[in-house]
């Protein structure tokens, strides 16, 4: 059986798994977000696709557990502002930037790469040209 590993030559893919605690010349120790790593790699390699994988199949307009919530098929700066305002209202803290940090990096990445936010189940479709999730455009 052909796997994703066999379909794409290693030099053509750059997996990014997660951020980590790192040394920082100014701060001593800091968090290096996996989203920031993706942004830097996308700016350098300029891939066709940049795909953020998360637990949900895209960016939702509300709580993903709520059956009334829907996926935004397109996330732009207006949607990002709306979600940022909602995030500030909930006062949830995530040192890695959470969804808002991911969207902000994705917006920048969309200048150099077709950028998506989706889940692991949708990933293989991208290799066959079947995109799904939330497309991010600046």
Predicted regions and their residues:
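C-terminal catalytic "cap/lid" subdomain
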Residues: 1-138
């Amino acid at each position: 059986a052909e796997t994703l590993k066999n379909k794409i030559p290693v030099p053509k893919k750059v997996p990014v798994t997660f951020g980590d605690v790192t040394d920082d010349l100014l701060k001593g120790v800091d968090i290096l977000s996996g989203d920031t790593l993706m942004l830097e790699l996308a700016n350098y390699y300029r891939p066709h696709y940049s795909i953020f994988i998360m637990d949900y199949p895209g960016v939702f307009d509300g709580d993903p557990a709520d059956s009334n919530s829907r996926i935004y098929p397109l996330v732009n700066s207006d949607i990002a502002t709306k979600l940022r305002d909602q995030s500030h209202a909930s006062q949830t803290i995530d040192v890695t930037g959470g969804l808002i940090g991911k969207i902000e990096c994705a917006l920048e990445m969309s200048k150099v790469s077709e950028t998506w936010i989706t889940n692991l189940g949708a990933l293989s479709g991208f290799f066959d040209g079947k995109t799904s999730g939330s497309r991010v455009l600046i």
